């Protein structure tokens, strides 16, 4: 459960991230594909090379969805309901991949905002991404 402090931390970080959605999203996907190459299997129809238009576009979509979750932080389940349906029933993404993506996003945020990425902020972002992952896998059951 996200505390009021966690929510404030997430919103504070997102205020810095939101101006870089395409760049950070693409970097997150690039990092995920490099560190966890098995995740590429869900993107066989994409050019998964660094800087590709498809990766930049999808990275931005991911970040926009996370922005929706931040903007509806008190009701993430409703904000991401359609996306949860899509990932569970159409794309059939293995739920473990959400954790891998979350880890890569935390690394990207820490790399670009090292002074902002305190241990408390790290915990808050990790909890937020865990909540997002739980919501996105909730319809798998």
Swiss-Prot record:
Query: Where is it made, tissue-wise?
Result: Red blood cells.
PANTHER family, sorted: HEMOGLOBIN FAMILY MEMBER, HEMOGLOBIN SUBUNIT ALPHA
The similarity annotation says: Belongs to the globin family.
* Gene Ontology biological process terms in this record: hydrogen peroxide catabolic process
GO molecular function terms here?
haptoglobin binding; heme binding; iron ion binding; organic acid binding; oxygen binding; oxygen carrier activity; peroxidase activity
Q: Is this entry keyworded Transmembrane helix?
A: no
What is this protein's record name?
A: Hemoglobin subunit alpha-A
Sequence positions that bind heme b: 87
What's the superkingdom here?
Answer: Eukaryota
Q: What is the lineage of its organism?
A: Eukaryota, Metazoa, Chordata, Craniata, Vertebrata
Q: Name one GO cellular component term.
A: blood microparticle
One Pfam annotation, family name? Globin
Complex and partners: Heterotetramer of two alpha chains and two beta chains.
Q: What does this protein do?
A: Involved in oxygen transport from the lung to the various peripheral tissues.
Enumerate the SUPFAM superfamilies for this protein.
Globin-like
Q: Which organism is it from?
A: Caretta caretta
Q: Which residues cross the membrane?
A: none
**Residues holding O2:** 58
The reply to whether Metal-binding figures as a keyword in the UniProt entry is: yes
Q: Where in this chain does the record put each Globin domain? A: 1-141
């Amino acid at each position: 459960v996200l505390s009021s402090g966690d929510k404030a931390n997430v919103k504070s970080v997102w205020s810095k991230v939101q101006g870089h959605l395409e760049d950070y999203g693409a970097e997150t996907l690039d990092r995920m594909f490099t560190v966890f190459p098995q995740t590429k299997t869900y993107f066989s129809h994409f050019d998964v090379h660094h800087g590709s238009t498809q990766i930049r576009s999808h990275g931005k979509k991911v970040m926009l969805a996370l922005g929706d979750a931040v903007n509806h932080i008190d009701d993430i389940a409703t904000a991401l309901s359609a996306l949860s349906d899509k990932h569970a029933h159409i794309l059939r993404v293995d739920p473990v991949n959400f954790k891998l993506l979350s880890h890569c996003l935390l690394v990207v945020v820490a790399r670009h905002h090292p002074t902002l990425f305190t241990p408390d902020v790290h915990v808050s972002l990790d909890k937020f991404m865990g909540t997002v992952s739980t919501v996105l896998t909730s319809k798998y059951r």
